[in-house]
Amino acid sequence: MRVVHLLVVLATYVSTTSSFNKESIKECAKVLSEHMKETFSKISHETILKQNYEKLVEEEQFDPRAELKKSKHRIEDYLKVRSQFAYKAKISLEARSVRNDSTVNDPQSKSFIRFMSAKQGNDGTTIYESNHLGKRLKVNETKSFNLTQNANFYTLPTSSVSSAVHIPTPLYDRNEDLLRKIDWSDIDAVYRTNREETKDLAFQLFCSEAGYMRYYPAASWFWDNQDEHLDLFDCRNTEWYINSATNSKNVLIMLDMSGSMLGQRYEVAKQTTEAILETLSHNDYFNIMTFSKNTFLLDGCNGTNGLLQATMRNKKALRRKMDTYQSEGKAEYEKALPLAFSVLLDLKGSYALYTKEEMSMMSANATNEYQFHLELPEHVLAATKQYIDSINNGGGDNNRGACENVIMLITDGAPNAYKKIFDMYNADKKVRVFTFLVGDEAIDFNEVREMACNNRGYMVHVANMADVDEKIHHYIRRMSRVVGRHYKESGQLSWWTGVYRERLYLPRPEIFAEPVPITNQSFAVMNKMASRRKIRLQKSEARSRMFVTTVSYPVIVNETFMGVAAVNIPLTEVAQKSHPANIGSKSYFFMLDQNGFVMTHPQLRPIDPFTKYHKQNYNNMDLLELEVGQNQNVRSSQKSQAVSDLVCESGANYAECVDDLRKAVRKMIIDCDNSDVQQLDVLYATELLDRVYPQTNTYYAECINHANFVLGLAVAKGDDYRVVKKQKKYDFGRVKMDWMGDKRWRLHPHWRYCFLNDTDTHMSKEEAFEIYAQQMSDSGKAPLLCEYRRNLVEKLLLDMEATSNLIDSWDTQFNFMKNNLIHLAFFATPSGMIRYYNLTLQDYDYIDPYWSIFEHIGHLLSIEHAQESYNHFITDLNRKSTDDRYYRRAVRMKDTIMFDVSNNSKIWYKSETQLTGYGLNENLTMLGQAFKAIYLDKAVLGVSGFEFAYDHVVDTMAEHGCPASDDRKWCVLLDEHAYVFFSNQNDISYEDYLVGKGKHISQYFGGLNRIAQRAMALLVENKFYTKLTYTDNQAVCKAEKVVTTSGNRLRPFYPIFRFLMQTFNFMVRLASQISGGFLIWLPNIQFTEAYTASFHEGTDVYPCPKQSSFYFSNKDGKNRPGTTHLVNGNRSERPCKMNAKCSVKMEASFVDGTNLVMVWITQDKASENCYDESECSMEISNQVPFGFEEVKNEETCEENEKRKSKANDVCYSIDDDDSENERRPCSTSPTIVSIFQILFGVFLHFCIF
């Protein structure tokens, strides 16, 4: 009972409480500090831990450059093996030939082709007869996938029976040419051999130019919408396919916005633009031009800044701007084409366009500046000599290193082919021109076809929305021909992507058995099943954050490009080759791709915590957007002991120097230049962005050969120490099973220690390691499957040995822990091992005793409605050791016991009459934690901590001058960021806190009320806290929705229309595929919501910087306050403008050795209504604001940073891409649609209207 506990607390402090003045905040804080340090010392056994470690390890100051090189070589070896597997698949495919059987669709023939469908999960199919009857034949399956959880695929269910084949929705899966290519690509034997050689080999892929994708091992398909079986995926739009299939390119999209581009045409044009953008990778650059009577480039600088890198951030930004333009007037090609070439080629000099009437009215010397004149049908183009020379020399230097220049023209027709313009700008045909004629009734084919055919391009007719996806890929096929012809030039050159979220790893919806009748006896089974489901969801959540890079090779057969062979590599595996256990606890590795964008970084937050989608800018973040500046001081060069401030030409503070800083740091890292390392003062943020910690980093970098990545290392000041084993060679024969016999230890769930067999999903990571440990003990050497991670395994064994007697030590403190309501102690190590000790408190239940199963009939197996239980701080909530929030906090506050409160867990009182520490009858208590980093001098050994019932805090504070009471004397404990750890307001509710509606606890102190706001300002003014400003460059903002109204009486029937039109579109596409024709007509009703994959998610948000102030404890600062009084002379403060009677005195004192600050606010005797918001409201002009707000910058035209990709070292020449057989055909021609299709469409059209 809580009364008994309180008596124990009173007895414990009987000698102490009589020896200090409870009216003195300084003495109260001092005694509280001594108590907390004594308690932590007894629980952590810090002295014993250090003694244990000193027998096994020694401290070492490591060389960052040497450690970085070791990690670099490990990563290179790892990536090289994956690259070889992809190359092996390429060679195997190129040695095969495509069959030419004519009976591949005849189930009675031996040549009948089956394949394992990714969407169906078997090899069954439906064949549609290619005749006027349109009959279909159902072919039953002979094989199906038996998907089982795979231990080496992060428990994702896979099948090794065969590879799976995915076919995009617009393609007919029984097209004979498609089937022959699917059969040709069946190299499962190669895939299987590769997989057997390397346990942690991820998905092996092949994407065909025909559109299908084969992947091994098979896994169920991830639908974009599971309920509707919506599938937007096409492997030909992936970065790994685009990189290998085409040269890198500079692309200018010209979008006709003339008056005829209205309604359906414009919607098709927008969809075509999206589809083109979908095919651009980070190695490409682009801009979009709208033209009618005027021309506009959609970037913020109207083209003066040239082309933008094709990041998703830039693509979505320009796509949004398209919606702000309307169709009007005439399409002025004579204005648009010269501007397009000027921007695309970055031409120097100038030109002007005059009408013929304007030219005739000018004087003879009016155009002396322009020495060149070209007469066009409606204008005269006048240009300077510099401009003409620039054209003849191939343009300026703004092509950013891309290989090809491309114009994409989207129009419903052109009045002229403008041969003179193309002859002037593109005489050598170095610029490809692709034309997309949109609209089902478009008839002006000849002019746009001539533009494409005369300029190494291709023309397609995009009749309607159903046409878009497949028609777009004609341009890629056209550009891939040079890859086929010149493939020998690249040799064994591999292509690597940046980071992306692999859809094959994404969690699929779980399917559960039908509910069974609920009985009194079934609730235990129900709870157990709910617990297992919780574990499965945790694992699937981990997979949802699976990001990969992919290595790929083009597959060429007889100089014909056939597709791309690839292997993807989870970045969590790559990161373990540069393991955090090898460096200091505050230091970290990071990796950049060939474009300089961040791939891995502890501050990268790629997933939006609310939508669970990846952010638009997740794979195009610059390093300095994550290394957020701490203050105005920017340091450079460590060659001398005195670190000098960086002085910029533009100024001397951070804001003015940011551009110079970006160039200096980024150039050093991209160039892998460690000769003059850079140092920055930065803010390290926790994952939830509720805490930031200042630290000074020194940066080092190494280039990863072949992949063109950059591996970086940020070493925090004073953090270049680690522990290493005393033995040069670890003796595995000394491994004892007793070290792990108690089962109260856990390993990092995302780190591999030893490889497993695919089928070892029935055992936990800990159980598997015990088996390997037994083999070590028996044989005296490391098992083969542990050799790959030997260094980490040795560190783990050292931690296990050093902490093996902790359980016994914790046993000796059983009574002490019980009396102080401590029910959990733990120690987390850099090797990822956490050892813990559980103690069940007698007066508390760990499963909700007030829950009744009969209240939740119908919710069987639902976590939310299963009987609630205690969420274990380690086994349920914090399994990741060094990656967990508490660990990262502890190592950044050396020699400090950190106190925190958690709303993720609770325990229940056994007695229904027991009251909380605040005197409320709520049946439960929340939990608090204390933790601290343990050091062997300067090197971290781990983080020790314990968890306790929060009632103990309330009772302890009552004995240190702060009993729960009214607001006459308000006592609070603030943590290092001024969040409230304890408040003595007597109406604080645990239940409210646990559902996010609590009062005071865990809230920012300065935002509670006007009194707290003023007190917080004084805490900053008196140097208890330092004000910091953090900019979140990864934030997202909600886009303002444009609301439109319509009086259309048919609007309620739109869902029906949508279904009918989708059904009709499918039938026509199917008939078109079977007949080999092309779709050129559909009724005019189209529902034009974006369905292109990359533009399907997150359309209501956009990337934006957000900024917030933070307040960091100055307990170790140089200007630590010398008095406890927040107002000079301990005078009263009157913070309420509307209430002159409110008068308070404010005091504060650090609780030494902890992260806490004790604050007392005492009302004078005559003081009234200080906490009544109607009489004492918060100040609008807040001196201590807190909370993220969007940084509203005026839109200015700033030059984009020029990024030259390291991936563009090889460019295939297009000079010979001009032969007759290559140029003809250079377009798709419309074919007559069957009478049946037209009649059916007209019938449906008139039925609707």
From Swiss-Prot:
Membrane topology annotation: Single-pass type I membrane protein
Organs and tissues of expression: Decendants of the cells AB and AB.p (that give rise to nearly all non-pharyngeal neurons), decendants of P1 (that give rise to body muscle) and cell lineages that give rise to the adult and juvenile motor neurons. Expressed in body wall, vulval muscle and pharyngeal muscle.
Disulfide topology: none
Transmembrane segments: 1229-1248
Statement: the UniProt record of this protein carries the keyword Glycoprotein: yes
Species: Caenorhabditis elegans
Record domain VWFA: where: 250-479
GO molecular function, one term: calcium channel regulator activity
Reported phenotype of the disruption mutant: Worms exhibit a weak egg-laying constitutive (Egl-c) phenotype and slow irregular pharyngeal pumping.
Glycosylation sites: 100, 140, 146, 302, 520, 558, 757, 838, 903, 923, 1130
InterPro entries: Ca_channel_alpha-2/delta, VWA_N, VWF_A, vWFA_dom_sf
Parts of the chain on the Extracellular side: 20-1228
Membrane topology (Cytoplasmic): 1249
The name this protein goes by in its record: Voltage-dependent calcium channel unc-36
Stated role: May act as an auxiliary subunit of the unc-2 voltage-gated calcium channel which appears to trigger calcium-activated signaling pathways that control the serotonin response. Inhibiting serotonin sensitivity of the vulval muscles results in egg laying defects. May act in both neurons and muscle cells to enhance motor activity as it is required for coordinated movement. Has a role in neural depolarization-induced calcium influx and pharyngeal pumping. Involved in restricting the expression of the putative olfactory receptor str-2 to only one of the two AWC neurons.
SMART domains, A to Z: VWA (SM00327)
Keyword Calcium among record annotations: yes
